[in-house]
Amino acid sequence: MIIFKNLLKLLIILLTIKLYFCIEIKREEHLTILNELNENSDVIQYSILPGNNEEYEIVKGIQEDAIVYGYYMSNVEVNGWAYLSLVSNDKYNDSTQSRAFGYLEGYLTKDLIWNSKVNYYKNAFNSSEIPNKLDDWLTENIESIHTFIVNNRKSRYWNQITLVMDQINGMLDGYNEANTNSSETLSLHDFFVLNMFGDLFDLMPALNLDKEYKYFQKDLNDIQDWFKRSQHCSALIKVSSDYSELYSGHTTWSGYYTMLRIFKSYNQQFSSDVSGTLSKRNIFSSYPGALISVDDFYLLGDTRMVVIETTNSLVTNDLYHLIRPTTVLSWMRVIVSNRMSTNGKEWCENFQRYNSGTYNNQWMIVSYNLFVPYNELKDGALYVLEQIPGYIEFSDQTQALRQGWWNSYNIPFYETIYDASGYNNYTANNYSDSTIYYMSYQTCPRAEIFRNFAGYVESLEDFQSLLRYNDFEYDPLSHKLPFYAIASRYDLSKKNPSPFGATDTKVTCNSMIDQNTIVAISGPTTSNGQPIFEWNSKIDFMESTSHLGCPEKYNFPWVSFSDTTFRNL
């Protein structure tokens, strides 16, 4: 009995020591994080606490009883990105967490949001206001969402949409609370528009606003001009030849005025039983005022999935009548799908619901749980979905990935989507050979460049290099045109140069997933000696393109981002 008591005491002592060291390790990790973030004096730490009369109290530092706490670095001159990491507290209900989440982000990022709004409205609408037709459509859409929510209170899907609305309304309130200038007050519709960057490329023509707003004009006789404004990105998913590593990466194409960037980490402790939230941790490249990536590129920490898209622009006007306000916009559906899915098939099934027919993309969902180094890829490792108004198609494309890689470059893969989107019309004799060549899934320039180089990728450095690739002067596959490249540079075109092209690259791989880490770089590519982009060196662009808050010069390093740190590499 005495021996037993002594053993019990010893066990208690050992457990106490273990607990002490666990607490100390956590404390040391936390202090390390704070020290790393505090190396830059621009880092802000705030907590949001419940106040009186349903208001919030925002305090400096990290508080244990905070609804949400976060780290924020606003200086984009450091490495081309602002940085925001927010964590909510599961002691509070989902709605309270979500609204406070949005509120703190809106409050902290107020200046970036205003600059981003000014740039987008001036460049897209040539105005400071939302077009009336679009404003009316948004009113109908938001009313429809509220009706669905009221009529589906027990639905986890609509509970998720409710949380999205809570978050965006919270962001609106936080922004306006931080704002001290009445002329810079924003509305809920403004925040919707900031999240609808991709949706608007289809919605504006559907509302017949493309003729009024040059930014959205689509001349089917000059399809490359339309692609220059609507095409969004190159992507590559690559398994190494010995199956030791699986890489996922994405290069955004966009107007250079969008290069006011922010990397975000959301840790939203919503319930799994009420809202169906299965992935609470999400790190992604983004823009001020957006709840989504827009690029899109997400690392979902809890489900070990990477979600990527590139845009498939419609080259027909025959489908726009299918776009209606009684659906759910793409930006909302991707949030819900990210939270409610544990694999690619589930993600696709969630995303296809309430198809808005806007932001018609090819989505790639990589399930790293189905990748084991040095073993054959399991079925379901890669799902690919494509959307057009009125129709969505998806399937398991793991077999294609087993051959080495999957590449994506703004041309539809599925034949039904390709034909319905109008691409098959450009094989007729009344179009030039170059146009037909550019519209082909198999022979367009990026398809050939990927085919030429992807097989040689065997390291993270190789992967990064390919996604920044532009050697248009010497690579015959580029035909001496700077936009026929993985990372385009339309500003270098001798004919009609414009401030458009590859604006970033983000990559991750299996060995980085468990650390919730993405490596990224901001700005136009300098691959193969391409010149560094500087606004001051482009006088025409300076005068015609609003780029408020953007760095003047883009010569930034690769940066490693996680949910707790960012470091220049």
From Swiss-Prot:
Q: Could you name the Gene Ontology cellular component terms for this entry?
A: extracellular region
What is the enzyme's main class? Answer: hydrolase
Q: Please name the InterPro entries in this protein's record.
A: PLipase_B-like (IPR007000)
One Pfam family name is: Phospholip_B
Signal sequence, renumbered to the chain: 1-22
Its biological purpose: Probable phospholipase.
Protein name in UniProt: Phospholipase B-like protein D
The record lists the organism as: Dictyostelium discoideum (Social amoeba)
Report which gene this protein is encoded by. plbD
